[in-house]
């Protein structure tokens, strides 16, 4: 019992801390929790727990910005995202654990590289956005969250503030719901993992709120370095050890 309480406290602190860091640094989000979840739950359950937590987080963002959501763009994104998320989720349920762990490690390293070298993102048309949805749905099913890589394409459509936040979050909700249906059918998502993911959502929301409060008081570069260092170290460990 004591061990479970300590583990729960660790996960709450990790959720709060990573949300705070990502809110100040401007990127990272749920991705920062991946190595923590992998260490605690293993790679397969880690993606399921992160998916539940991300669904709760994105769902609240959709609600707060519901009047500004571009529903047409969400439908276009979903046309590619839903079938691809099903395919990715099915692959996750059967993928060897060591291989899956290394895929997550590569993804964490790719996050840092993408941030450093990404080109200016051109505006893509409707077909391109459906293709983006497919790539996002498949990738999200394997690693839990690809938001930081997808966000520039929403911004390139001229979206700002509530329209951007709500539309990007609504697109993520579609992917997460699709994945959870498959995870539930394949017994990857259990009551235990689902409740853990939901329980961590308030801690992440509190961390994000705190991060916004301290954003103007602390040097952002310090937080960016910390986030990137954490992603690199975690990615290398997962890649080299396979869990």
Regions found by a protein language model. Give the residues of each.
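Residues within membrane-spanning alpha-helices of integral membrane proteins
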Residues: 8, 51, 105-108, 112, ...
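Small-residue-rich hydrophobic segments that form or flank transmembrane alpha-helices
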Residues: 8-76, 133-137, 147-201, 208
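Small-residue-rich segments of transmembrane alpha-helices in multi-pass membrane proteins
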Residues: 35, 39-44, 78-89, 111, ...
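Transmembrane helix-loop junction
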Residues: 39, 93, 156-157, 216, ...
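Loop-to-transmembrane alpha-helix entry segments
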Residues: 71-76, 94-108, 126, 193, ...
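Interfacial loop-to-transmembrane junctions
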Residues: 208-231
């Amino acid at each position: 019992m004591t061990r479970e309480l300590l583990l729960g406290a660790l996960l709450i602190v990790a959720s709060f801390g990573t949300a705070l860091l990502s809110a100040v640094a401007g990127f990272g989000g749920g991705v920062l929790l991946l190595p923590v979840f992998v260490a605690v739950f293993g790679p397969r359950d880690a993606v399921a727990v992160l998916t539940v937590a991300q669904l709760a987080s994105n769902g609240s963002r959709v609600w707060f910005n519901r009047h500004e959501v571009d529903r047409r763009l969400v439908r276009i994104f979903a046309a590619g995202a839903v079938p691809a998320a099903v395919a990715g989720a099915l692959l996750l349920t059967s993928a060897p654990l060591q291989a899956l762990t290394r895929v997550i490690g590569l993804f964490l390293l790719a996050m840092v590289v993408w941030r450093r070298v990404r080109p200016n993102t051109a505006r893509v048309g409707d077909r391109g956005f459906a293709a983006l949805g497919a790539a996002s749905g498949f990738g999200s099913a394997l690693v839990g969250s690809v938001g930081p890589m997808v966000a520039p394409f929403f911004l390139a459509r001229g979206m700002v503030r509530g329209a951007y936040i709500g539309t990007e979050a609504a697109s993520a909700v579609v992917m997460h719901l699709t994945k959870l249906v498959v995870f539930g059918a394949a017994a990857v998502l259990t009551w235990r993992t689902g409740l853990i993911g939901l329980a961590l959502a308030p801690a992440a929301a509190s961390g994000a709120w705190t991060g916004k409060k301290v954003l103007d008081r602390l040097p952002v570069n310090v937080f960016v370095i910390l986030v990137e260092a954490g992603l690199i170290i975690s990615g290398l460990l997962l890649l080299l050890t396979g869990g």
